[in-house]
């Protein structure tokens, strides 16, 4: 296995991260959905709206784990893993699990007792990775569905 270095993301990583975000969106067959920019991401990192880890092999960014802090009235603060992505040429090296574990270690060290994420039902490799640890599929076990409003829907609702 090649040696890699994992660092906490900073605003200076925004260009590298947005590039991987576009790659992930293309992989997920949702490329046209990405409207974020490197500059907006840079500001969001500065403002602590998003956090993460970026893995490097040499000078080349190999993968990322982006997350944010959320809040549950039942358990308090928790972490939502937004994007766990490894570039194709760096897959099957244990990097995804290492980046994911880094987030679990952060949660443990901060006393955070919940880590949530979503995965597309056809992404069998990601699901196989997640199946290596204990978790609960909330759709199956508790019947939770996740819903989303886009900007147009928000404006329409707010303007009613």
From Swiss-Prot:
SUPFAM superfamilies noted in UniProt: Acyl-CoA N-acyltransferases (Nat)
EC number: 2.3.1.-
Keyword Transcription: no
Enzymatic reactions: S-(2-aminoethyl)-L-cysteine + acetyl-CoA = S-(2-acetamidoethyl)-L-cysteine + CoA + H(+); O-(2-aminoethyl)-L-serine + acetyl-CoA = O-(2-acetamidoethyl)-L-serine + CoA + H(+); S-(2-aminoethyl)-homocysteine + acetyl-CoA = S-(2-acetamidoethyl)-homocysteine + CoA + H(+)
Secretion signal, residue range per the UniProt entry: none
Principal EC category: transferase
Domain of life assignment: Eukaryota
Annotated InterPro entries: Acyl_CoA_acyltransferase, Diverse_Substrate_AcTransf, GNAT_dom
Residues where acetyl-CoA binds: 84-86, 92-97, 123-126, 130-133
Pfam families, per database record: Acetyltransf_1
Single GO MF annotation: N-acetyltransferase activity
Protein role: Catalyzes the N-acetylation of the amino acid thialysine (S-(2-aminoethyl)-L-cysteine), a L-lysine analog with the 4-methylene group substituted with a sulfur. Substrate specificity: thialysine > O-(2-aminoethyl)-L-serine > S-(2-aminoethyl)-D,L-homocysteine. Does not act on polyamines, such as spermidine and spermine, nor on diamines putrescine and cadaverine.
Oligomer status and interactors: Homodimer.
Protein name: Thialysine N-epsilon-acetyltransferase
Organism, as annotated: Caenorhabditis elegans
